[in-house]
A protein has these predicted regions:
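A short SAM/SAH-binding and catalytic strip from SAM-dependent methyltransferases
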Residues: 136-152
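Conserved beta-strand signature within the Rossmann-like core of class I S-adenosyl-L-methionine
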Residues: 159-174
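Class I SAM-dependent methyltransferase SAM/SAH-binding core
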Residues: 77-124
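Glycine-rich SAM-binding Motif I of class I
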Residues: 70-74
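Class I SAM-dependent methyltransferase Rossmann-like catalytic core
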Residues: 8-55
Length: 177
């Protein structure tokens, strides 16, 4: 007689697009995000962080003006910690409350006291204008949002030193690291 086995497929773990892994060196929580690694902006973010660290910097501020669920920003902050930054601040903004909720939930799983995050529901212009008084080291955005919108371009110039966007043919602008 054959045994019949049933499985509740709804109880199976679902793979997350971005998840927090185990505790890494120095007590940090390792963020692994295949979404972030495949983002066309990741190599520019990685290079900017490396250049800032190589220049002797120990603190870094990163702003993602259209962060979605926050995977790229959170991955950048984790990478900054792995590079040896000791004070890391990330600010993400997006117009979708649902995506900001996901970003906040992911950020809450990172328990490293050297990494501070803030996510808010805001449009790109509002988020960038909030950075004018204390410009970020790196601002991440989608160039398509700024195309043909001079107010976005001006806000980007004032919001950060290094601008990272997804237009491969366009050079990042702002002051060099």
């Amino acid at each position: 007689m054959k045994e019949h086995m049933t499985m509740n497929v709804h109880a199976l773990a679902r793979p997350a697009r971005s998840h927090i892994g185990g505790v890494g060196q120095g007590g940090t929580v390792a963020l692994r995000s295949s979404t972030a690694l495949h983002d066309p902006r990741w190599s520019k973010v990685e290079a900017a962080l490396s250049a800032l660290r190589a220049s002797g910097r120990h603190a870094v501020r990163v702003v993602d003006a259209q962060c979605g669920a926050g995977s790229l920003l959170l991955h950048a902050l984790h990478h900054a910690r792995a590079l040896g930054f000791t004070a890391i601040e990330g600010h993400g903004a997006d117009g979708s409350p649902a995506l900001i909720g996901r970003a906040r939930a992911a950020a809450n799983r990172c328990v490293d006291p050297a990494v501070g995050t803030q996510f808010e529901v805001a449009d790109m212009i509002t988020a960038l204008r909030a950075e004018h008084d204390l410009p970020a080291d790196i601002v991440i955005c989608h160039w398509s949002a700024a195309r043909n919108r001079p107010e976005v371009d001006v806000a980007l110039h004032c919001a950060g030193r290094i601008i990272v966007d997804d237009d491969a043919g366009r050079q990042s602008f702002g002051a060099a690291a």
